[in-house]
Amino acid sequence: LNPYKPVAEIRDEIWKKYFPETFSGKTKTDAAHEALAKSQEAQKALGAALNVQAKDSTEAQANFEAARAKIMADTSLGTEDQQKIIDHVRSRCYTTHGTRSEDRTADKVSSEEGSVLVRDNATYSLAVATHGTHDFVVAGRIDRLEISPEGAKTLVEIKNRTRGLFKCVRDYENVQIQVYLHMLGLGRAKLIEQYNQKTNTIEITRDEELWDNVIWPGLLKFSKDLHAKATRGPQSEPCASDAE
């Protein structure tokens, strides 16, 4: 459901991390690092971009575009390597900016709405399946919890937008939130999207139909497929080329 991160890409990353003895392909990150190793200028562009603490989304966008221009101007790199590096720089820049912006967004919403948003540093997990001797779980950390005066908890997910407010929840964001709701045993969530000084809050409820018919079967299938591939022996060719 996430157009920006295909299933094969996620599978490769998990495969390499937890079953390195059978993984002989290359993850997208591996390919980007190989391309970066060919160019000192590209490495400098990435380092400089990550050191910029953008004050808002517009500045973060300008920072990435400046790095992109430097990479595109590097004639020592082929077009394919340039694109691998640009994708990597984009991901690193926007992820870093989103993490840095999270506190400001939470403080702004708390002040404007009079709500209590509590940071939760715990790592939550949800058991999915056991295949052979391997247990498969989904684990993650949430952004905030909103605590009402009566003590009721609402999950809060904060998203930094780079080009404007969506005013809606993307399917892949809803899947993430539904998984967190099941991990924590909660029924309600809020997605707070932020772009520069603007914020928008979208309320989301636990969707059991989506969970039963789409998300849970998808998790079971993913775990089964990953186990089958990771335990059959070394790859004969890069996993990323497998059809999904």
Short names for language-model regions:
Residues 1-244:
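Accessory terminal regions of nucleic-acid processing enzymes
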